[in-house]
Amino acid sequence: MDILWPVFTMGALSLLFSLGLVFAYKKLKVYEDPKIEQISEFLPQANCGACGYAGCRAFAEAVVKGEAATSGCPVGGEEVTQYIADALGVTAEKVIKKIAWLHCRGTHEAAKNRGSYLGISTCHASHLIGGNKQCSFGCLHFGDCVRACPFDALYMGEEGLPVVKEDKCTACGKCVDACPRNLFELHPASQEIIVFCQSQDRGASSRKMCKNACIACGICSRACPEAIVIENNLAKILDYKKIEPDKIPEIEKCPTNSIGRIHKDKNEG
């Protein structure tokens, strides 16, 4: 009998604790909308952060709660947007396809060197000491953006500048974040004209440093003043939609080709 009392006591305590756990589970259980799992499984699982959340699962939770737009996943595009809208029973938002473009034409041949850089071969490291080019606004040529792209949508071209593979670009924005000189921007795929320069130096100085730099001559802004202005010694497109097709030839009279069509050869052919 002496041994039975401890056994009964332990059994009773085990039963009591078990009942307590069951009660706590039911009382403290957090309900999760099954749509979160449904949407999460359909997402690309890139976990790139382009949606503004920590990963695909976090985005799924946010979109189900109404905290994120159905079109918030740029990697998924229209297909994912439509799927999310159908799952939530709402109207799908319009998806504007965007592509990352480099605002620089400072190739090895065009942009003059100011010295030899022997440090760590990254743009961020080179940027800390001003880079090895005379232009302090141009591309540093070390390819941080290429290494940051999770979709193999960038490669370093023979001229020393990163080249975008349009069919692979998802507008995730990783290249935008990777560039220490903010040379990448996400533009609607339909936008054909951009400014291929970010230099804010005075025209004469810019031209000496890089023959493809904007010299703020004003040809483009005079051709289309309602869409293009000159600010801080640099051409700036205020509204691409206001650029009429018949104005494009005038805009492209730019003496340094620092503004113009992205696909000029394709459009001419």
Model-derived features with residue positions:
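Strongly charged, low-complexity linkers/loops
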Residues: I219, V229-L234
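A generic structural motif
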Residues: L161-K165, L234-K242
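Surface-exposed, short loops/turns at beta-strand junctions within beta-sandwich domains
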Residues: K242-I248
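Ferredoxin-type iron-sulfur electron-transfer modules and their immediate structural context
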Residues: D2-C217, S221-A223, I248-G269
